[in-house]
């Protein structure tokens, strides 16, 4: 069934199953990397993010300190490849812009390609470091005290994630800077993952909400990639050999990024239009007939 709880299994068993599936998937990729460049790093980081979002659903039962401690450990695993992932994203974003706009940026492309190769060489052994860390995390999570956790507790966490997203949307509307959009995006993605976990409560409604959250997260993600590339290019402003390409590319990125942020804000206003208390009440209705 994948990244999803099952109504016929004990809730604690379902959560533990999800934890182990994400750990096993990440470790499996480390042991048997994908042949395509960048795929292993991307997929391992995705499994870690899904795991962290699922772990936070248990916060009210296991306690903030335990949850925060494990979250830090998982973030440390992700940081093993953060620089490599960043270099790959910058290069792929450039290639996407180049192809979509039918414009060539050969010198910048060479710069980012060489940068990616450098990080690939520097972090060539990251999988060997990640595997034992993942195994230890899996062992710890098997011992988490989840026997008394309820659907009500989990839905309460989701309602808080929704409210946090509303607050971050308001901040993004006010500031409209890359950092505000990035922070808002993290809340959107966490909510998307958590809705996927809760799908069995009301598959029709929650799959629709999850789909909207996914779309919003993708818009914000592309906008973040553009802002990320733009920040990297700003460091090359003094290079006269890149001057013409930089001017063209920066103009293109700003234009595309502005449009993505506009679309994200429009969708975000609709997605977060429901008051947080009304949202929490609507989610709670789904558990009325469920046994904890």
Model-derived regions, located:
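Function-determining surface determinants
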Residues: 1-292
